[in-house]
């Protein structure tokens, strides 16, 4: 339940794509799927094409009026209100400030979701494991390709 915060200028599709590019630049190798609500910013063609066609990331949508389908996200949004109360204007907020808040949120243990572990620690462990699997997969794929080429000779 790692939290990443990216400042979005507006809900316009071009601003969402720009914000997602920053997110993907930072965390792309760790992203396999996205589950979004049904906000207009997540259903624009520009955003859909960028995420699904260009990045090849599966995008899922929660059922309307079913916030429980994104329970962890709703919980983290409530926690974010400790730093930015509802109604706060993000006009003067800088990305650096959001990075600091995300770092603090990721350092706090999550009793239910992670059995008291800190999201940053779990994220790092999972990311390292994922990289090992990815390297093993690439080696296996390369070996199979070489075997196929040898069989063709």
Regions inferred by a protein language model and the residue ranges of each:
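Short catalytic-loop micro-motif centered on adjacent basic/acidic residues
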Residues: 5-6, 33-37
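Short acidic/glycine-rich loop or secondary-structure boundary segments that cap or lie
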Residues: 3, 15, 42-45
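RNase H-like two-metal-ion nuclease catalytic core shared by retroviral integrases
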Residues: 36-38, 45-52, 59-82, 91-103
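Active/binding-pocket-proximal capping segment
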Residues: 11-12, 22, 50-57
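Loop/turn elements at helix/coil->beta-strand transitions in domains of secreted/extracellular proteins
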Residues: 29-30, 57-58
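Active-site beta-loop-alpha junctions of metal-dependent nucleic acid enzymes
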Residues: 5-28
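C-terminal domain-tail junction helix/linker
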Residues: 86-153
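Short small-residue beta-strand/loop micro-motif enriched in glycine and branched aliphatics
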Residues: 1-6, 61, 86
């Amino acid at each position: 339940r790692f939290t990443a915060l990216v400042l979005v200028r507006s809900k316009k599709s071009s601003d969402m794509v720009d914000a997602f590019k920053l997110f993907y630049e930072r965390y792309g190798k760790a992203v396999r799927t996205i589950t979004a609500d049904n906000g207009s910013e997540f259903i624009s063609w520009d955003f859909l094409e960028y995420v699904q066609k260009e990045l090849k990331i599966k995008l899922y949508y929660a059922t309307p009026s079913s916030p429980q389908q994104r329970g962890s996200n709703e919980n983290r949004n409530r926690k974010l209100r400790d730093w930015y109360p509802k109604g706060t204007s993000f006009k003067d907020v800088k990305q650096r400030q959001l990075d600091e808040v995300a770092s603090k949120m990721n350092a706090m243990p999550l009793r239910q979701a992670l059995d008291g572990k800190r999201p940053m620690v779990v994220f790092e462990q999972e990311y390292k494991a994922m990289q090992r699997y990815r390297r093993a997969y690439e080696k296996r794929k390369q070996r199979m390709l070489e075997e196929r080429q040898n069989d063709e000779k």
